[in-house]
């Protein structure tokens, strides 16, 4: 991240609303709006994802791979949300945290970013196998299998973030890419992963829908709905931002030189970036509206909390039987 006062900045997240005096008011509004939004998203994500983690650990079985994937998505969103207050500070004071934290925080940011898309992709592949070829996922995965899959995704995320870690440094513009080449490479890499995962997920859901239309099992229909909602929310949030980042590379490489178009892109990048960064608080909302089991568990948790405050006996616990769900269903159906 960076202080936005330098129009030559090459950082991944840069947009320049301050390059012209007439844009001063727009910049002040953008700074205020982003500060308020990030603080709100941080609080919502912290509360929402913490509740999801509590429900998963207390009421659900972690022998299910789908539960493991959702748990890791929550962790990834929590890490992402905890970085939002850090990204506010450059708007007001520039980068004041030094070179080491510049590299470290951008590495953590990238790991969180890539882990989300990798877990969504592998969760969709797992759902595809469960629906299209249910016998292949009927057996409960061993602890070793669950650990290996989780570790593989996090290791892949760390390796994917190496570029952002090495080539970020503190410059006059703030915490920034050291050269335009590395900025372009990073954008293209992220766009590539985004498009590959989108292609894989689209293929899986086409096959899933074809199978479900031939099946009369309402259970199987329910097992797809929440994951589909999570995936759609992710791509609707991050898709516009990835597209505007790609358009920005056309200006940086001077393929497009229109000043008016560039200014419009800066506004679009501001809006799309704030939408994308708000995604970390969306999943708990989806669990409430789409996940029947999560709603039930959440009501029970809130009732317990309320009865605790009134110093009255809490209602009877919801029965919960450990073990994998049929067809390795998602937690919150």
From Swiss-Prot:
Any one cellular-component term (Gene Ontology): external side of plasma membrane
Any Pfam family the entry gives: 7tm_1
Cystine residue pairs: 102-175
Name of the gene: XCR1
Membrane topology value: Multi-pass membrane protein
Species whose genome carries this gene: Homo sapiens
CDD domains reported in the protein's UniProt record: 7tmA_XCR1
Cytoplasmic side, ranges: 60-69, 126-142, 210-225, 292-333
Family: Belongs to the G-protein coupled receptor 1 family.
Residues exposed to the Extracellular side: 1-31, 90-103, 168-190, 251-267
TM region(s), chain numbering: 32-59, 70-89, 104-125, 143-167, 191-209, 226-250, 268-291
Keywords in alphabetical order: Cell membrane, Disulfide bond, G-protein coupled receptor, Membrane, Receptor, Transducer, Transmembrane, Transmembrane helix
The keyword Membrane is assigned to this record: yes
Keyword Disulfide bond: yes
Primary location: membrane
GO biological process: one example: positive regulation of cytosolic calcium ion concentration
Protein name, UniProt field: Chemokine XC receptor 1
Gene3D superfamilies: Rhodopsin 7-helix transmembrane proteins
Cellular localization per UniProt: Cell membrane
Top-level taxon in the UniProt lineage: Eukaryota
Entries under InterPro entries matching the protein: CCR1-9-like, Chemokine_XCR1, GPCR_Rhodpsn, GPCR_Rhodpsn_7TM
GO molecular function: C-C chemokine binding; C-C chemokine receptor activity; chemokine receptor activity
Described function: Receptor for chemokines SCYC1 and SCYC2. Subsequently transduces a signal by increasing the intracellular calcium ions level. Receptor for XCL1/Lymphotactin.
